[in-house]
Every structure is written in C-alpha cells, then in structure tokens.
Amino acid sequence: MTTKALGDFKDSAAFSLGVELELQLVSKRDFDLTRGATDLLGSLDYDERFGEIKLEITESMIEISTQPQSTVDGIAADLSGLRDTLRQHCERNNIGICGGGTHPFHHWPERRICPGDRFNDLYQRYGYLAKQFTVFGQHVHIGCTSADEAIWLTQAFGVYVPAFIALSASSPFVDGVDSFYQSARLNAVSAFPLSGQCPPLGSWQEFTEHFAFLQACGIAQSIKDLYWDVRPKPEFGTVEIRVCDTPLTIEQATSLAALAQSLARWLLRTRPPLHTAKQAHVARYNKFQACRYGFEAMISDPVNLCQTPLKQTLADLLEAVSEDARELDCADWLSPLKQAVAENTGDAAWLRARENQHGNLNDVVREASKRLMGKNDQFQEKTK
C-alpha cells in the first residue's frame, strides 16, 4: 500500500469559505443518468475564474468547487458562475445537470468508473460500493487559523451534523421508489469502513498520531480515505463539513455555507462545552433520525438525558447564530433556512410533491434540472 504523508496544517484566514457540489449529469431524452463526464470535461473551455470543474468517481457525476472566499456573497458568485459555465457546455452536448442527493431511478450496475488511478483503486478496493457511490453531496470548507483550532472545530461541528442533514435533505427516492427517508444518500456513504464521526481527538498532535496509526495498520493511505462526517483538511487549512445532500438550487447551497460560517464564528466565540465522549454514544442514532425524519427527527441529548425535536433545535440554532451572521454580512442568506424550518418545507418535500403530481420520476428529474439551471419554472413555489 502506498501511503501519503499527512503534511503540515496550512493555516487559513478565519472563517474563509469554500464549497464543493457534486452534480448529476442526466440525459435530455429520459432524464436518467448519462455517462458524459469525461467527454464533457475534455471539451470544456474554461479559465477557472470561478473555481474548478472536475471528475468524480463515475461518469455520471461532475464536481464544481469554488475559489476560497472571505464572504458568502463571494461563494454565491462563484457557484453561479460555475453553474452557468457548466450549463452552457452541457447544452452543447445535450446533457442536463441536476441537484439532489440521489438520482431517483438510476440503475447502479450501469455506472462506469471514471479513468484515473485513485478512482480505479477505489473500485478495486470496494467493488460494487464504488458504483453505488454515485450519490451527490455538498461539502463546505471553513478556514481555521491553526491546526488545534481545526481539531476543536471538527469536534464541535459534530454535534450539529443532524442540523445540516435535515436542512439539506434532498434524496427521498432510491432505485425508483420512495425510501421514506428525507436523506437516503448517507446510507450509501455509511457502507464505507472509515465513514462516520471523527474519533474524540483533542489536539492536532492526537489527530496526527491517530492517522499515523491507521496508516501503519494498512487501513488508510491518505486523508481522502477518511469519509468522516466532518474532517480537517490540512492542505487547505480548513474543516470540511461533508454530510449535506447537494441541494436543488445554488441559492440553497449558499445558505448552507452561510450557516456553516456563522456557526463556526459562534462556536469559536462562545466555546461551549463539547461533551465529546457522551456525544459519541448518540451520534449514530441522531444521524439516523435526521436522515429518516428530517425536521421531524427527535434528537437524543446525552447531557440532559432527554430527546428534543430537531425542529426546535434548528430554530434555536438559527437564532443563536444570528448575531454572528450579521457580523459576517450573511444574515440574509439564513432567511430561507428559517422559513424552511418554520414552514416544514425543503427539497425532499419538493421532490415528493412533483412525483405526486406527475406520477413518474422522469418528469421529477426534468423539473429538478430546470430548477438547478436557474430556468423559470412554474413549480418553483415552496411546497408544504
């Protein structure tokens, strides 16, 4: 096994931001997934002014990633530019792009692994799981000023994993049927052996020792093998939140980035006790609750030994970070999240409403593709 050294943590500007979105490539004929990623990227004439457009593990996916930004408005501008650039090139190739955490009806054995040593290694190592990993997430990077701060923030964000899952949930359909989940995507991620929560590590030194142990045991080659819900990213100088489904719009993706930035500031400003060891006992259950029930989840509190409605927790969270959002000049971006919680709306509900209207999932994907691409659509009203 060839291992890659962890390297030093590259300090970043406090609360700087970056966003990655994994997007679906769909056929304009039947809106099933298509296999055009390599050809699309090969024909792309783009100067990377807004960030990167790159391959993901299968030919039915494409990833866009913003430039590092100091503001949420900068993230919004990059995502809009990336989306518009990709849309223009996709239209020339008769391909649609679409958000959502899962494609509602694709058949995973039909997926083709993208060329590249890492992708091939993943396929050889994990077999069919690599093709089933054709799911689509949003990752948010938050800049940290030191390595120890990054580890503390990784642990602190872990408590809020259910909040980000519920607010981003957009994967109710799997294999052509309603999964009854709000976010079914994370079930595909959970199959990998190094998924889940970061262990209770208290410093960068403890993290480097833990990672060296995993390498020595032959478990991990590089930090990319850690599919944790939240993980440090030393080469970027960030903490990366990895549990969000790809939303149906770039506006929603931007709102989630605003919450991550505001929450990071609030956490580092107030330094609440983390109770990391106790939280570890309930993390998996709380994650399931958020995936299955979304805003209706009941979250277990290992400190007060009770359960709390996630909807109330979300409302309290959005209120708690409001001062920090104002200081970061991103308060307006939190308004859609507050409205979604208050009205019990979201992308999963929108997708189910479209399926209920049409009675088929092809038209659901067609409308979802329009929604991501920013085209006028009579069905873009909020769904209760």
Swiss-Prot record:
Any GO molecular function: glutamate-cysteine ligase activity
Role: ATP-dependent carboxylate-amine ligase which exhibits weak glutamate--cysteine ligase activity.
Entry keywords, A to Z: ATP-binding, Ligase, Nucleotide-binding
Family that this chain belongs to: Belongs to the glutamate--cysteine ligase type 2 family. YbdK subfamily.
InterPro entries: GCL_type2/YbdK_subfam, GCS2, Gln_synth/guanido_kin_cat_dom, YbdK
GO BP field: modified amino acid biosynthetic process
Record Pfam families: GCS2
Record's catalysed reaction(s): L-cysteine + L-glutamate + ATP = gamma-L-glutamyl-L-cysteine + ADP + phosphate + H(+)
Residue pairs linked by disulfide bridges in the UniProt entry: none
Top-level taxon: Bacteria
Name of the protein in question: Putative glutamate--cysteine ligase 2
The EC number(s) this enzyme carries: 6.3.2.2
